[in-house]
């Protein structure tokens, strides 16, 4: 199964350390599927149901079953096949995916 950019699925983030996200939770694929094809890794962002509002969080609006906030400050490259991901739960709208990717890119802007 090929996970595509904008797909939401469940993945186990363990093992993790410190402030890294833990346990099985929904995640959003941020990277293009070509990355997965060539190196076997997918850049993902975990989704949380926390009530906290951080500038690096994006509250989902175009999903039906998966609710929560995409944690853009917790992205990680994972081998989804090795972690047993076998089902896509939902897919974001193109409009919402663009908003998220634009916000993600801001994390890498040059500092003055």
What are these regions (language model features)?
Residues 14-18:
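Short, charged beta-turn/beta-strand-edge "cap" motif at the junction between a beta-strand
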Residues 22-24, 28-62:
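Compact nucleic-acid interaction/catalytic patches
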Residues 2, 20-23:
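Hydrophobic alpha-helical segments and helix-packing faces
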Residues 1, 64-112:
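C-terminal terminal-subdomain/extension
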């Amino acid at each position: 199964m090929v996970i595509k950019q904008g797909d939401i699925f469940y993945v186990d983030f363990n093992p993790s350390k410190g402030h890294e996200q833990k346990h099985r939770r929904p995640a959003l694929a941020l990277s293009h599927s070509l990355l997965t094809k060539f190196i076997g890794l997918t850049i993902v962002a975990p989704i949380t149901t926390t009530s906290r509002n951080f500038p690096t969080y994006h509250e989902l609006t175009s999903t039906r079953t998966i609710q929560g906030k995409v944690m853009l400050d917790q992205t990680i490259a994972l081998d989804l096949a090795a972690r047993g991901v076998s089902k896509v739960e939902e897919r974001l709208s193109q409009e919402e995916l663009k908003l998220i990717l634009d916000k993600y890119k801001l994390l890498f802007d040059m500092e003055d």
